UniProtKB/Swiss-Prot annotation:
InterPro entries in the record: DNA-binding_RecF (IPR001238), DNA-binding_RecF_CS (IPR018078), P-loop_NTPase (IPR027417), Rad50/SbcC_AAA (IPR038729), RecF_2 (IPR042174)
Function in brief: The RecF protein is involved in DNA metabolism; it is required for DNA replication and normal SOS inducibility. RecF binds preferentially to single-stranded, linear DNA. It also seems to bind ATP.
Record-annotated disulphide pairs: none
Main location: cytoplasm
Cellular component aspect of the GO annotation: cytoplasm
Assigned keywords, A-Z: ATP-binding, Cytoplasm, DNA damage, DNA repair, DNA replication, DNA-binding, Nucleotide-binding, SOS response
NCBIfam families, A to Z: recf
Location(s) in or outside the cell: Cytoplasm
Organism whose genome encodes this protein: Microcystis aeruginosa (strain NIES-843 / IAM M-2473)
Protein's name in the database: DNA replication and repair protein RecF
Family listed: Belongs to the RecF family.
GO BP: any one term: DNA synthesis involved in DNA repair
Molecular function terms, GO-annotated: ATP binding; ATP hydrolysis activity; single-stranded DNA binding
Amino acid sequence: MYLEHLHLHSFRNYAEQVLKFESKKTILLGNNAQGKSNLLEAIELLATLKSHRVSKDRDLVLESDSEARIFARVNRLYGASELSLILRSSGRRTVIRDRQPLRRHLDFLGVINAVQFSSLDLDLVRGGPEARRDWLDTLLIQLEPLYVHILQQYNQVLRQRNALLKEIRKQELEGKVYGDLSQLKLWDLQLAETGSRVTRRRARVLQRLIPLAQKWHESISGKTELLELQYIPNVPWVEDDVNGVQRAFLDKIETRRLAEKQLGTSVVGPHRDEVDFLINQNPAKSYGSQGQQRTLVLALKLAELQLLEQIIGEPPLLLLDDVLAELDIERQNQLLDAIEDRFQTLITTTHLSSFESRWLQSSQVFSVKKGHIFY
């Protein structure tokens, strides 16, 4: 997989920028707040239709405009493809593949695959469970584009069910009895159906990722530490069986019925899943040093790269955003050695001193200043 061409129009602080990539390794050099991360964010959007930095499209559009455009041409083993993404301040999006507008966003996904590694990824260990769920879901979207639809279905059911629970709670607080609970039973069934699809896929992808992450972690730590990853679904289940998982959902919903009515919200489902990271059987979040936490995240990212390559059949893009500054020299070398020329890599930095001369000689260096890129 090779990204040949990128064109940004009114995206973030880029009014108009065209880039042609002529090397497997591209270094984006510049001071902070010049637009280096914005460029990687544009590629991330093409790969996942998500930004890990903001949730509103209006934050992605240049202030003086009402819409932004991202265009890319990528070469893959099966041929070349062109992608266009139009973002509007209103929130409405248009996705275009090979000059054909698409009705379904999932038909846009999977053309570009990328792994992003930034200083924000340390929140995977330090932050709350939502960060770890988002990480897992972003990986799943690239491995199985249909998952974006599965996740949307679940979130829609969750919103509707929460609205009903809120109404039930409101009426009970007013001293009224909510008469017809059959509607809630219907939402229970839909939550179990859509939620089981989410949780089963999360469990499967983590099962494939764990041995890869453990191998990388062993290599980086010099076999001195044992990494464990544990998926803790909110609804525990034993066998990967559709009916069995759905029954487990309905059983737990029944046991938590009173709590849900009192709180006016759903307390059962994959929106409350957790992923635990353990180092030598101790929680990495509480007991891991900064160095151990960085080693863990580096191992996860290298495992993501490896898993994507195994499943899609070619190396994905690697986007490194100010990550070298977060790693010591030994871990920097581990990362750069793992990359070599295997993955097309875009890396942001404020200075070139972190790179060996052989890296610089084989890299294309762009200077970034106030939303302009100079060759």
